[in-house]
């Protein structure tokens, strides 16, 4: 029995599912989750001292790699003064200034929270408070955290009220969220024609990445902006995952900044916290000043703007200049090409969706454009692929519905390990369970 096996058995006794977030439990791929004891640069080391090349990056935040010396120094300096003040701090101000400056005029102010869930929840409350309307429009497969308003799935018909996607979410709450198939601008138009005067906001990921990466249809986000504004609603662009990762200005920098439109509100997370609990809502001064204490829409948090998290985020953003993004994009190009070549060589049907340095590998022979098509991938083949990759020293997300993340810490030696590991994983996906241990069935 491995140390991870022993720790997981203990964890199951005191933590639901043995984890603090469901995907970590390996339920979709089988087997025992590996417990991590340290990470440095592009590598993860588990409690059994096995080393992996990291292609998860803590689900996105570790864009400059783990334990980068400049980030570590900034955090140590911050915690030496205290782990929390519960009061304004200079580092909080400097991070706010950096986020606003990087967005190039798209936002004037930010409000920090501790998680992406809180950030989107705050943005939704703000939109409802400003418009005095109840409805939110989201898209099936887009994840905006686990607040009650967003744990819904679409019913049949364009204007179907949301149904709770989790026990504990009252139907009355879910009923104020309408979930539509992603990419169907015709259904958005139909909904607004019928109920546009009730909609507070459309909430969308700039690039969906929580059902796997989905490439937005040409002009889709701009049309969402235009439709919302034509009916007096707001557009909330959730960039918790994509913000400051896809480009210096996130997904918006690849789309809206070039096309001449701007969402009303943004949400950020992951990268801006440098791996620590931090997220934010951003927008124009006119909208953001509806938040207390300037305005009537309430939001608060004891640890919001935590100095250690702000220090980590500020140091991380400072590392990500234009050259760093160019290097990151080039690395992602190479890794995605390796995955494509390995699966092609093994004869495994697959599709790779990619935007900038973010991509997903779907084991299916059909285009993946929304949650319905993503759900048709071969999850059993992915389980074989995942475990063979893990054995070969690759740290992948334990689900076929996730993005692959690269960091600037990946080097040529890492890429050789990745290439070899992906070929082994592809062969396992093609051959079935015969080459795997029984525990992984």
From Swiss-Prot:
EC number of the protein: 5.4.3.8
GO molecular function, one term: glutamate-1-semialdehyde 2,1-aminomutase activity
Cofactor: pyridoxal 5'-phosphate
Annotated metabolic or biological route of this protein: Porphyrin-containing compound metabolism; protoporphyrin-IX biosynthesis; 5-aminolevulinate from L-glutamyl-tRNA(Glu): step 2/2
Cell compartments where the protein resides: Cytoplasm
N6-(pyridoxal phosphate)lysine modifications at: 270
Xref: CDD domains: OAT_like (cd00610)
GO cellular component term, pick one: cytoplasm
Claim: Secreted is one of the keywords in the record: no
InterPro entries linked: 4pyrrol_synth_GluAld_NH2Trfase, Aminotrans_3, Aminotrans_3_PPA_site, PyrdxlP-dep_Trfase, PyrdxlP-dep_Trfase_major, PyrdxlP-dep_Trfase_small
Reactions catalysed: (S)-4-amino-5-oxopentanoate = 5-aminolevulinate
Homology family: Belongs to the class-III pyridoxal-phosphate-dependent aminotransferase family. HemL subfamily.
Subunit annotation: Homodimer.
NCBIfam families per the UniProt record, alphabetical: PRK00062.1
Protein name: Glutamate-1-semialdehyde 2,1-aminomutase
